[in-house]
Regions:
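Transmembrane beta-barrel architecture of outer-membrane proteins
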Residues: 1, 13, 103-107, 200-207
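Outer-membrane beta-barrel architecture
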Residues: 1-3, 17, 59, 109-111, ...
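Transmembrane beta-strands of outer-membrane beta-barrel pores
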Residues: 4-6, 20-26, 114-116, 125-129, ...
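Conserved small-residue
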Residues: 5-100, 140, 151-168
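Core subunits and conserved enzymes of cellular information-processing
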Residues: 9, 19, 40, 105, ...
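Transmembrane beta-strands of outer-membrane beta-barrel proteins
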Residues: 14-16, 108, 114, 119-121
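Short sequence motifs at beta-strands and strand-loop junctions characteristic
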Residues: 50-52, 98-103, 193-202
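Extracytoplasmic gating/loop element in the C-terminal half of outer-membrane beta-barrel translocons
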Residues: 127-214
Length: 214
């Protein structure tokens, strides 16, 4: 914690308060075996050698020529539908994306006093964590679910896989030819393509007050 008086004159005063915290942890021993689905969930899960709330991802390997996402599976093969979410033994293929808990966080505020008026501007900040983006992709959509903003950049025609990572909206033919197509979209939702930094600086409060002369 750091507090400073930047300016202190008869009718004007400016003060700053700064709070900083750093948190770090590591699981050194763990008996139970986690499943793939536990480790790729955005809430974070424990794995020996990593932070308590670690987030892992299925390695994304791009779209194929039909706009279907592909991944590296537990056997080292590139696949669209071969990810087994209940796997407990072969989990080393997963990518460590980061921790769900921020490692650096705190707040800072400035207070300005001028002829009885007082203005307070307060910010909070948080850095070092990752978030799993919403699981919005699936093999079939309704009018209510086909609304993610990412769809404007989706795969549409062959060759688009060179420029986008957003899967195709599957056709009825694709659904018929691959009854396991839903697995590809589910894996995409939990892949390295759907990870984002959770860093933020947020304006938390702005207040104005006045102290009447006594």
């Amino acid at each position: 914690t750091l507090s400073t008086v930047n300016i202190n004159k008869k009718n004007f005063k400016w003060t700053t308060d700064f709070i900083y915290s750093h948190a770090q942890n590591k699981v050194t021993s763990l008996d139970n075996q986690q499943r793939v689905i536990d480790l790729v969930a955005g809430t974070g899960f424990a794995l020996e050698g990593y932070p308590v709330r670690s987030v892992f991802s299925i390695p994304y390997k791009g779209l194929n020529s039909e706009g279907i996402p592909t991944f590296l599976d537990q056997d080292g093969n590139v696949t669209s539908t071969g990810i087994y979410f209940q796997e407990r033994d072969k989990i080393d293929f997963l990518e460590y994306s980061g921790t769900a808990d921020p490692t650096d966080f705190g707040s800072f505020g400035n207070t300005f006093s001028f002829y009885g008026f007082k203005v307070n501007v307060f910010f909070t900040y948080s850095f070092g964590n990752v978030v799993r983006m919403d699981a919005v992709f699936k093999k079939r959509y309704s009018d209510l679910t086909a609304m993610p903003k990412e769809f404007k950049n989706r795969w549409v025609v062959p060759g688009d896989e060179k420029y986008t990572d957003i899967p195709v909206i599957a056709s009825s033919t694709q659904e018929f030819n691959d009854p396991n197509l839903a697995y590809a979209y589910n894996a995409y939702n939990y892949s390295s393509a759907r990870i984002a930094k959770g860093d933020f600086i947020r304006l938390k409060e702005v207040s104005l007050s006045y102290d009447f002369p006594q």
